[in-house]
Amino acid sequence: MESQSKKSSALKTLSSLWNGSSSATSDPVTVLDRSRTHHHRGRSTSSKAQPFRLDDSVYSDQPPKDHISLARSITRPESASESKIYAPSARSSLSLEAVVGKKVSAKFAKYLSQTDDDWGVSNIKASKSLPRMARSTTPNSSSRSLFPQNGVDTTTSRQKLHSSGRFPLPAKLAHRSVEVEVAESNALVSRIKKFSRILDAPIVDLNALRTLAWNGIPSEHRPIVWKYLLGYLPCNASRREVTLKRKRDEYNAAKDSCFNTNTEPPPLDQTIWRQIVLDVPRTNPSILLYQNPLTQRMLERILYVWASRHPASGYVQGISDLVTPFIQVFLSEYIGDKDPMTYDIALLDETNRNDIEADAYWCLSKLLDGIQDNYIHAQPGIRRQVNNLRELTLRIDEPLVKHLQMEGVDFLQFSFRWMNCLLMRELSISNIIRMWDTYMAEGVQGFSEFHLYVCAAFLVKWSSELQKMEFQDILIFLQSIPTKDWSTKDIEILLSEAFLWKSLYSGAGAHLKR
């Protein structure tokens, strides 16, 4: 009944927009979509927590100064798999036809037909009197032509009704239209050209690069873009080669001083070395690249040199995980289209391997400079992050936090690893690399502050499942969260939700206030 009343209200809004107030917005469906944005993916609809009122600025088409625009990807589904969040029930769709009937105006009937895909009801057979609308050639565009093309239905990949007579929610279609594939290919080419224009400039516009990188970096540009975003390379083109050579030589000298010596290292160094040697073989054991002896020796040297040059923290378990995305990304710069995860690094000459090792060391150092409190004695940075995660989650999903407290689950028991390893044990390395594109685009706070909001969105995603579990099941679930089949799209949705929470709560510790 509640869904039918919401649908009736939505129809009244649509009717009023069509008959006289449509000039208020260029896309009336967006108004309805905004009213439904509190149904985030993974959130329990039965939660009693009151949703927060969002500022219009959060949903405007103009991006924040320091971020790429996420409003369109947040307020409207971009694919068939996402549109199920917004799809009404079959019963409400059928009642729609009964109410409208023959009395509906021709214009409004056409409008309903043109928006059927946005509401996820494209699989409902339309009345013969209503012409079908032609899709826009842009895959994610909400606009439709108001007239059929020669009376022929140009909409492709329509789902057939289930044999049971029900109207299933849209699923990923087995066959995609040629138009969509061509449009996506053109969009990728256009995006690559935008990166190339920025990177080929005499002085790289770092703000423009961050804005563009927020939504992901093409694999062919990722190695150099990461180096810019982390501050490893200077923006001035005339200084790049000189700086790169100097930094690589500096690392090689530090490496030689640590490993090419006839004197016995002090006991503390031996302790660090033994721990590193134990941890490296356990790093990404299922990926061939990291089981290669040459890669393992590379990891050992990077970790030991970093620990020796940062005595306040030394080596802490978990840092070994943070090196691997850099090695994988920088390796891809030398092997073309081959898969870095299965590539035999022995095929590279020693000079290229040394360059990859040096670049990975310096980028790891830049990353850890922003979160070094996580790895000093007693790891106060991680404990502070865990406490902030608890308070933030309490604001977002109070029933979930109360359930965890009632079951005796402490946030430290499961989220310590999230902060220590930056979710690398919870997500595949390919998804981590995509997530790091956004972290680096966020700037110096990407791996600390923004990561906190990603962890909150990640936890709240499983709220409905967790609230049905008891203590032991909760801990088992949170130690092995089912993300094996996650794609890049899942990561982008997670990042979008984290951006929303950050827009609401960042600054002045707002999320800590009750």
From Swiss-Prot:
The protein's role, per its UniProt record: Stimulates specifically the GTPase activity of ypt1. Functions on the Golgi as a negative regulator of ypt1.
PANTHER family in the cross-refs: LD44506P, TBC1 DOMAIN FAMILY MEMBER GTPASE-ACTIVATING PROTEIN
Biological process annotations from GO: vesicle-mediated transport
Regions that span the bilayer: none
Rab-GAP TBC domain: residues covered: 216-443
Gene (UniProt): gyp1
PROSITE patterns linked to this entry: TBC_RABGAP
Record-given protein name: GTPase-activating protein gyp1
Compartments in which it is found: Golgi apparatus, Golgi stack; Cytoplasm; Nucleus
Tagged with keyword Disulfide bond: no
Protein keywords: Cytoplasm, Golgi apparatus, GTPase activation, Nucleus
Record carries keyword Cytoplasm: yes
Start and end residues of each stretch annotated as Disordered: 17-65, 130-164
Extent of Polar residues compositional bias: 18-28, 135-158
Pfam families named in the record: RabGAP-TBC
Listed SUPFAM superfamilies: Ypt/Rab-GAP domain of gyp1p
GO CC term, one of those recorded: nucleus
MF annotations from Gene Ontology: GTPase activator activity
